[in-house]
């Protein structure tokens, strides 16, 4: 199926960045160059997909699914149920990490997947191998299948979302909606989990501090690493150490150096060239200058090979020295050696940046380091010394950061790795994808657990805001009711709205909203995007705006206040009538 590229393009410059400096993603040629030798083409699976937007990850194809999706599709086709119009909701039942909010992420990749959905000749061949007895007519049908008959509704990527509110609503032929299930869940679950984890860490770190994602080496493989860097940035990280994520997504890149850079020096003789030009172009010996300050300050007991390593790095980056100071002893060697080199750089017209703490009592060490910086700054009358950046890394996580805040610290930058990218506190979000309407009739899935019962029918969510500007409740409205008489219209500003708990009728509240936000919008229809894909920086900014509107008690780390997700009286009645009609009546004798 051919389609115009016009509404799908973003502004690009030659280096793949938009004019405002945010990333637009790599160009086709850049991706081809970056992918190196691989059996997966990150750009085109075949010539037919050339005019479409495509998933950024070459593994995201219709075959990235569970086998039973294909076997169900075959059965739907064989029983002539494949073209029946269906509606599916993708949502989650409980927010992660013991919290009350989630950040929705992964929508762009969902749209890319849906837009590019089709089976290549080779993929149809794989299906034939997996189901040898399937009829050729079914394979022919699959080879012509595309997403032109699908309509996709979604909340905005970066939205703060709550349990039971659909993140996506997929409408289309039953066979297509069913074939989407596993892939959509895969694309949304991890993305939203990481973005939420990053947002929670950002709340713990605070607005005034810098938060970096340093998790590449601990991530769950290359694909997990790239997704984690992307969605950590969306949720709150200010930068990443992941070079490829910087190249693909334009995420600000940050880094220091490793302990191996320090320990690879054993003495001054191994620094073959200690020369450095000052800002006027005059040549000096940086090691001799640093040793002079070492003698002057009485730091002669520090590890000399560490000083040599700092000098070597400073020669390379005279305005970018962030020294890792815990290789031997943070306060007895690392910090004093850094000060000596920083003083020498200052004399030459340069400014060191700061230090990184990677072990020990981060609260105590950061405060002791700051005190020493202040003393030296006053002694040499250098104002910026007391403002040196102190970076902390040491297996940080949300509880550790909160504890540091309680203890007090002088940390400026939190470099978070393992616990951010792997979501160690909770490994999965648990989104589900449920059929809620078939051929115009609402459907329900029952369970002994009330929270696993689906909310039937096509629904649109509205966020109702109170007088203080905070959201009070997300209200789910049955779309069929919105076209009926006036008593069943959508909520309106200034008018009282009855909001009911979906399963407990006694839990109800009347809300008079001062502002109403419709949460679901068509993002894909008739084979076309209905709006441009926003840049990652724009999604990130939207996420920050969303979080700033939520009441603090909903966001807090410990015992957050539950957020209300309600239904209208009409949807409540539909739900419970369908519930009663669907449950068999038991007989007793």
Curated annotation (Swiss-Prot):
GO molecular function terms listed in the Swiss-Prot or TrEMBL record: metal ion binding; nicotinate phosphoribosyltransferase activity; transferase activity
Example of a GO biological process term: NAD biosynthetic process via the salvage pathway
Region feature Disordered, mapped onto this chain: 1-30
Polar residues composition-biased segments: 15-30
Pfam families for the chain: NAPRTase, NAPRTase_C, NAPRTase_N
Keyword Cell division: no
Record keywords: Ligase, Magnesium, Manganese, Metal-binding, Phosphoprotein, Pyridine nucleotide biosynthesis, Transferase
Official protein name in the record: Nicotinate phosphoribosyltransferase
Cofactor note: Activity is highest with Mn(2+).
Catalytic activity: nicotinate + 5-phospho-alpha-D-ribose 1-diphosphate + ATP + H2O = nicotinate beta-D-ribonucleotide + ADP + phosphate + diphosphate
Residues reported to bind nicotinate: 68, 256, 356
Record PANTHER family: NICOTINATE PHOSPHORIBOSYLTRANSFERASE (PTHR11098:SF1)
Organism: Dictyostelium discoideum
